[in-house]
Amino acid sequence: MDSSLAQEIAAIDGVELDSEVTFADLTTLRIGGKPRSAVRCQTTEALVSAIKLLDDASLPLLIVGGGSNLVVADGDLDVIAVIIETDDVSINLTDGLLTADAGAVWDDVVHLSVDAGLGGIECLSGIPGSAGATPVQNVGAYGTEVSDVLTRVQLLDRTTHQVSWVDASELDLSYRYSNLKFTNRAVVLAIELQLLTDGLSAPLRFGELGRRLAISEAEPHPRRPVRMVRDAVLELRRAKGMVVEHTDHDTWSAGSFFTNPIVDPALADAVFEKVGEPTMPRFPAGDGKEKLSAAWLIERAGFKKGHPGAGAKASLSTKHTLALTNRGDARASDLVALAKEIRDGVLETFGVTLVPEPVWIGISIDD
């Protein structure tokens, strides 16, 4: 941006210009080159004002929250990084409504809700990133999705630069998807969640978490105290390297890298016949489809934890095959090569195409 525009943006209360930051600093993968410039916004008003000025100048923007769902190319990038640092969270204990600014750390939001005795998002504990990203990809884990509790989102329309609250029903929310994903038409400014007020979790599914909580398959609509569920989820995620720890390279990742594939029953049957394991995970996915486990497919295609082994710059986590990790000095090209190897290996073995979950900036899995 030219100096006059930079001065105008810097004059906005709550804005700080940053000429040194890289995307390696801004993402949980710790990979990525340098933006043309970066604009840090500490208030919603500052965020709206800065984006309007930058849009009016027709500059390419990348809106960055927690950086947990980004794969960014190496080198210098012709983009302005707008970093959302708004972090207010408000809770109405009477009706269970929680409102969070887009820049609030998601796990802090979950922690606050649990401390307040509110249920509904405890299964989403430990997920990295910001609150504003959760509706964009409809974040989910252990049988819970943000769409289960999301009532509305506050959006900045990038065309009109008007701010409005939009009902969750207008977002086309589905498995790891909303109509905000892969588009620059709007920026999430805040989210509103309707939570439960009786101190218990949302109904839990039997499975890994259910076994940890001693839930029986025969127990109808099981619920547990929210803190008990949060603690169990964090234990499970830490064991898989899915809670960010700066000293643990298994957590230098974008979380679950591939979505669980939704396939026709005939393809699921073919996978079952090929592997012959009676415990193959497969679940109803609606519309006559079935959901398979991406991690299970990766392992059965011959890719073990830690693949391709010690010394690799990018590898599968040593704790969980669904996380692609930076072992310390990986470049974007290293991660792309690994992602392509995994995707192509599963396709060749099972005929199932794995779809990456992160957003790609300046690079793609086919590069």
Swiss-Prot record:
Its pathway is: Cell wall biogenesis; peptidoglycan biosynthesis
Query: Which EC class heads this enzyme's classification?
Result: oxidoreductase
Active-site residues annotated for this sequence: R176, S256 (proton donor), E357
Q: What is its EC number?
A: 1.3.1.98
What the entry lists under Pfam families is as follows: FAD_binding_4 (PF01565), MurB_C (PF02873)
Where is this protein localized, as stated in its record? Cytoplasm
Keywords attached to this Swiss-Prot or TrEMBL record, sorted alphabetically, are: Cell cycle, Cell division, Cell shape, Cell wall biogenesis/degradation, Cytoplasm, FAD, Flavoprotein, NADP, Oxidoreductase, Peptidoglycan synthesis
Name the PROSITE patterns on file: FAD_PCMH
Query: Cross-referenced PANTHER family, in alphabetical order?
Result: UDP-N-ACETYLENOLPYRUVOYLGLUCOSAMINE REDUCTASE
Family matches, as HAMAP family: MurB
What name has this protein been given in UniProt? UDP-N-acetylenolpyruvoylglucosamine reductase 2
Task: Identify the gene encoding this protein.
Answer: murB2
